[in-house]
């Protein structure tokens, strides 16, 4: 299959890029080619451009291309998805929007979160923007059969990111350093609340099952692990892995 990843060299998407290539797909990656943590994987075809800056340039890059699937890893606002609708309507078989599990109801009325849980987060604009994006894409699906699939990742980690709430995005190993020095660390709540972590390569396998799947069109999915841990357990597992 011929696949376009918009982004494609981030924490989650890099694992998906590697798996797509290993599975024999023809993978195009559209980005600015600036990532140092996750460079362009061998075998991928680079379309160099800034998806948020120059739509005319993007249209020329994509003018003669037809993709089986497009996955936009870096659409955050309704303006982003409006652009994607303009660029790809009638030219693709499937459009995958990467949303977020943070879009689910906050505070939740029930501890078990499913795809049917209402989308409502008054505490974080990022999440509200993702909800608006989802609603716009589903409207386009119902009105014009735009072939959208929505995916809601939860807390995903990989080689460059420690899966701990409170870890700095810029300096993710700061919490590990405190553990190694015997310093106190901040654990969410009283440590007993439950959470699910997802290794980025596991997410990639979940995505692979949805790409090219006609039954996924017009649907939303969350891709997470099936292992439920308390935050105390998560921090303890991290501490024990350090061998200190």
Model-found features: residue ranges?
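NAD(P)H-binding glycine-rich loop region in Rossmannoid oxidoreductase-like domains
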Residues: 9, 34-91, 97, 103-105, ...
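N-terminal Rossmann NAD(P)H-binding glycine-rich loop of SDR-like oxidoreductase domains
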Residues: 3-23
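Glycine-rich "substrate-gating" loop/helix at the edge of Rossmann-like oxidoreductase active sites
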Residues: 158-169, 189-201, 225-227
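Mid/C-terminal beta-alpha module of Rossmann-like enzyme folds, strongest
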Residues: 209-244
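Active-site YXXXK catalytic motif of short-chain dehydrogenase/reductase
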Residues: 126-130
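Conserved beta-loop-beta element that borders a ligand/cofactor-binding pocket
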Residues: 136-165
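Active-site "gating" loop of Rossmann-like NAD(P)-dependent oxidoreductase/epimerase domains
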Residues: 100-125, 139-143, 167
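A conserved pocket-lining segment of Rossmann-fold NAD(P)-dependent short-chain dehydrogenase/reductase
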Residues: 174-198
């Amino acid at each position: 299959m011929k696949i376009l990843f918009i982004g494609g060299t981030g924490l989650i998407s890099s694992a998906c890029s590697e798996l797509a290539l290993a599975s024999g797909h023809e993978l195009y990656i559209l980005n600015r080619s600036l990532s140092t943590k996750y460079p362009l994987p061998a075998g991928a075809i680079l379309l160099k451009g800034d998806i948020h800056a120059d739509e005319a340039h993007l249209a020329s890059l994509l003018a003669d291309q037809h993709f089986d699937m497009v996955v936009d890893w870096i659409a955050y606002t309704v303006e982003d998805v409006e652009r994607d609708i303009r660029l790809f309507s009638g030219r693709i078989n499937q459009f995958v929007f990467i949303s977020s599990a943070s879009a689910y109801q906050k505070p939740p009325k029930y501890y078990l979160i499913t795809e049917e849980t209402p989308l409502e987060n008054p505490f974080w604009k990022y999440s509200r923007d993702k909800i608006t994006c989802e609603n716009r894409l589903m409207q386009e699906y119902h009105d014009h059969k735009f072939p959208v699939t929505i995916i809601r990742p939860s807390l995903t980690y990989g080689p460059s990111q420690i899966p701990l709430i409170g870890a700095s995005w810029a300096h993710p190993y700061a919490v590990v350093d405190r553990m190694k020095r015997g310093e106190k660390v901040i654990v969410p709540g009283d440590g007993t609340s439950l959470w699910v972590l997802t290794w980025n390569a596991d997410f990639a396998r979940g995505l692979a099952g949805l790409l090219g799947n006609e039954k996924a069109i017009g649907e939303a999915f969350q891709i997470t692990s099936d292992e439920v841990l308390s935050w105390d357990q998560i921090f303890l597992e991290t501490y024990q892995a350090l061998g200190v």
